Amino acid sequence: MYVGRFVVVSPEVGAYRVSSRSFPNRQAVQRDGTVTVEPTPDAPETDNPYISYNGVRVTERGAVVGNGSHVDPIAEKLELGYPARDAIAEPLLSLDFEKDDYDTPRVAGIVGVDAADPTTNADGPGAVIGTVRRDALLVEEVTEPTLVATYEENSPTAFDLAATDASDVAREVYDHEYEHAVCSAGVAGSAGEFDVAVYNGE
């Protein structure tokens, strides 16, 4: 099944995977706690605004994963002290779904939300997942690994994720049976102490 790009979010582990039929010549590059999805050196030139973006941003209050330019404002709002729910909801609402031929949803999550955040009822780290589609804006707390994708699985749904460290998470979601994997990123930890890894199918 082809579900497009997707995030998996839980209190201490998260992932983002690029799956693409149209633009497979992309890679995930890690720089100082940020993972950027960008064209490979041999990729054809394109003016598509949805090809390159930060897919992971680590902050002191949680690690943000997502499928587009909304990752940056979510991370910035977290750093400003917004509750995790609001930090996701406001950028998703303002940026809305992608204005492409498919009305592609935006998906996002925050891993390792501080237990003091009013968004979470967790005793330890919490997690929040969200999506904005043409017909809905959904943001909710999650306590177990949960997936939301751009197509087919476009509402938060339970996901069987066994890995617990960042590199294994990145590899596990890349190798998942969903079709047309391009690259992936994994994050593990809690606020202030995150490990980040990428996998490009080498």
From Swiss-Prot:
It catalyses: IMP + H2O = 5-formamido-1-(5-phospho-D-ribosyl)imidazole-4-carboxamide. It holds the Pfam family IMP_cyclohyd. GO terms for biological process: 'de novo' IMP biosynthetic process. Keywords: Hydrolase, Purine biosynthesis. Residues 29-52 are annotated as: Disordered. Belongs to the archaeal IMP cyclohydrolase family. This is IMP cyclohydrolase. The gene is purO.
